[in-house]
């Protein structure tokens, strides 16, 4: 068996790993589906298709068939309420296109798109890891990617697998220094999920780093122009969706006010001030004293992790991406149960975890990851009464 496995091409190994992981996750999710009570999205004990298209999948369905509102829903108190502008168009319209071509229903089509892009993301992740480490570690990084605690999101009606596909492709093109090819990728990526601003920061840091190291690593004018162009494209695309929402609704703040409506249940309606959401969140969860201590400790710990020997072996560029995305989350995101899902774009960190070759260590990581899936599904996906822990 081992001999046959080693003779397989890398892409076949990656696809088999990801398929096996999805099979395990499907069994776990079916167990949860059997025990699922009637809720806002499904009846009791729904089939897999219904169970996997709860929560935000319904919003994507609304986008696909009802489009975006030109008039924002306003509460009696005058606040913007939750609406479709929080969900970007590439994933739902891709699903609708597949439905038109194949005749599939929404549940099936949304899962086909999500799972297909999950397979693609796994293939690109392997290629990305091969830029910085050997075949064995790269393949085990794919294993960790495939069985990660929040990996069930790769086989539900969400846009995350599509987002990770484009992030992996964009990072790979950056490491390959194919900046012109990168431009359309970052533009499309910015309309899958809000990623453009974080990637623009990463590309800006990448350009600065290449400029200061140009003596040992030449940075010719054509590459400079292309890299700066890709950075600008990502920056403009990152602001484009809020601008479009503002133009359609006539309210330039419509997108940010829509996003803020999701955290209002925790802290009420407040203005978005960069880098305050995590302070507000940690104070809400832990109180002002312990919240401040825990937040400072978390930021310091993450900064130190970026300089550990294993993470440094990922190379400067991937660490710049990790830092950029973390800074973006710190600036705009309110920490709650969706945090685990929103950490998914930091998947290059799995490459560092995959470097040690100790068999006990690797088996333990896989077992803990699969157990983590059960925890994530129990805490975040399964609907339990008046559920306040969305995935």
Listing of model-derived features with the role each one plays in the protein:
Residues 131-133, 139-157, 171-172, 191:
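Transmembrane and membrane-interface helices of multi-pass
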Residues 156-162, 339-340:
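Short acidic/glycine- and proline-prone juxtamembrane loop motifs at membrane-interface regions
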Residues 79-85, 89, 93, 101-120, ...:
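Loop-to-helix entry region of an early transmembrane alpha helix in multi-pass inner-membrane enzymes
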Residues 105-109, 125-147, 181, 316-320:
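Transmembrane-helix signature of polytopic, membrane-embedded enzymes
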Residues 21-38, 200-213, 221-305, 318-322:
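Membrane-lumen/periplasm interface segments of specific transmembrane helices
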Residues 54-73, 77-103, 270-279:
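Short hydrophobic/aromatic helix or loop-helix immediately within or flanking a transmembrane segment
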């Amino acid at each position: 068996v081992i001999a046959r496995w080693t003779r397989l091409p890398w892409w076949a190994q990656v696809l088999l790993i990801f398929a096996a992981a999805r099979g395990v996750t499907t069994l776990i999710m079916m167990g949860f589906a059997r025990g699922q009570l009637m809720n806002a999205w499904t009846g009791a004990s729904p089939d897999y298709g219904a169970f996997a298209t709860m929560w935000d999948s319904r919003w994507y369905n609304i986008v696909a068939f009802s489009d975006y509102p030109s008039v924002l829903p306003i509460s009696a108190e005058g606040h913007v309420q939750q609406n479709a502008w929080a969900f970007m168009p590439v994933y739902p319209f891709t699903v609708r296109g597949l439905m038109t071509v194949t005749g599939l229903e929404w549940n099936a089509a949304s899962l086909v798109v999500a799972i297909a892009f999950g397979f693609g993301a796994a293939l690109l992740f392997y290629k990305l890891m091969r830029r910085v480490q050997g075949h064995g570690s790269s393949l085990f990084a794919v294993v960790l990617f495939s069985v990660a605690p929040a990996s069930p999101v790769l086989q539900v009606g969400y846009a995350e697998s599509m987002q990770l596909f484009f992030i992996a492709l964009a990072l790979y093109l950056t490491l390959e220094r194919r900046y012109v090819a990168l431009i359309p990728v970052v533009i499309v990526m910015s309309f899958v999920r809000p990623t453009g601003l974080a990637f623009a920061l990463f590309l800006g840091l990448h350009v600065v780093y290449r400029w200061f190291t140009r003596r040992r690593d030449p940075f010719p004018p054509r590459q400079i122009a292309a890299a700066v162009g890709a950075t600008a494209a990502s920056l403009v695309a990152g602001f484009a969706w809020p601008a479009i929402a503002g133009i359609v609704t006539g309210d330039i703040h419509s997108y940010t006010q829509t996003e803020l409506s999701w955290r209002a249940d925790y802290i009420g309606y407040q203005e978005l001030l960069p880098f305050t959401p995590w302070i507000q969140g940690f104070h809400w969860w832990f109180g002002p004293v312990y919240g401040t201590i825990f937040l400072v400790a978390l930021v310091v710990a993450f900064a130190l992790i970026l300089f550990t020997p294993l993470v440094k072996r990922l190379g400067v560029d991937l660490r710049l991406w990790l830092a950029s995305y973390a800074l973006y989350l710190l600036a705009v995101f309110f920490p709650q149960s969706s945090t685990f899902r929103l950490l998914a774009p930091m998947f290059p960190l799995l490459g560092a975890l995959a470097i040690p070759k100790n068999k006990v260590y690797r088996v333990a990581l896989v077992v803990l990851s699969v157990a983590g899936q059960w925890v994530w599904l129990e805490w975040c996906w399964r609907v339990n009464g008046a559920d306040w822990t969305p995935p």
